């Protein structure tokens, strides 16, 4: 416990908060170029082939980003937009690729939560067929 005199001399130091997505540098999103697109397996209780991409950002930092949704058109040298948000069962993956932006296509035939996957509104005639 400091004395009053020590507090007058030095004051209290403010603890700096640690960010969950440091590569974004306090920006909501950042643009980058895919250097490698591949699949990886999740941590212990889960089993799948998760689609991820290694992305070199505009600030020269290289990160691993998750590709959400079913199917994608990404390959090496694709320009992508990344946002924060980790994938709980993939260690080291702290970013998501934004679907429907830049070179990334939206998810095809997506009917629910479309805005999160960059999918356009389905045509009225097709919606009746899907409903049954």
Swiss-Prot record:
<comment type="function">
    <text>With S4 and S5 plays an important role in translational accuracy.</text>
</comment>
<keyword id="KW-0687">Ribonucleoprotein</keyword>
<keyword id="KW-0488">Methylation</keyword>
<dbReference type="GO" id="GO:0015935">
    <property type="term" value="C:small ribosomal subunit"/>
</dbReference>
<dbReference type="GO" id="GO:0000049">
    <property type="term" value="F:tRNA binding"/>
</dbReference>
<dbReference type="GO" id="GO:0006412">
    <property type="term" value="P:translation"/>
</dbReference>
<protein>
    <recommendedName>
        <fullName>Small ribosomal subunit protein uS12</fullName>
    </recommendedName>
</protein>
<comment type="subunit">
    <text>Part of the 30S ribosomal subunit. Contacts proteins S8 and S17. May interact with IF1 in the 30S initiation complex.</text>
</comment>
<keyword id="KW-0694">RNA-binding</keyword>
<comment type="function">
    <text>Interacts with and stabilizes bases of the 16S rRNA that are involved in tRNA selection in the A site and with the mRNA backbone. Located at the interface of the 30S and 50S subunits, it traverses the body of the 30S subunit contacting proteins on the other side and probably holding the rRNA structure together. The combined cluster of proteins S8, S12 and S17 appears to hold together the shoulder and platform of the 30S subunit.</text>
</comment>
<dbReference type="InterPro" id="IPR012340">
    <property type="entry name" value="NA-bd_OB-fold"/>
</dbReference>
<dbReference type="GO" id="GO:0019843">
    <property type="term" value="F:rRNA binding"/>
</dbReference>
<dbReference type="GO" id="GO:0003735">
    <property type="term" value="F:structural constituent of ribosome"/>
</dbReference>
<dbReference type="InterPro" id="IPR005679">
    <property type="entry name" value="Ribosomal_uS12_bac"/>
</dbReference>
<dbReference type="Pfam" id="PF00164">
    <property type="entry name" value="Ribosom_S12_S23"/>
</dbReference>
<dbReference type="InterPro" id="IPR006032">
    <property type="entry name" value="Ribosomal_uS12"/>
</dbReference>
<keyword id="KW-0699">rRNA-binding</keyword>
<comment type="similarity">
    <text>Belongs to the universal ribosomal protein uS12 family.</text>
</comment>
<keyword id="KW-0689">Ribosomal protein</keyword>
<feature type="region of interest" description="Disordered">
    <location>
        <begin position="103"/>
        <end position="132"/>
    </location>
</feature>
<keyword id="KW-0820">tRNA-binding</keyword>
<feature type="modified residue" description="3-methylthioaspartic acid">
    <location>
        <position position="89"/>
    </location>
</feature>
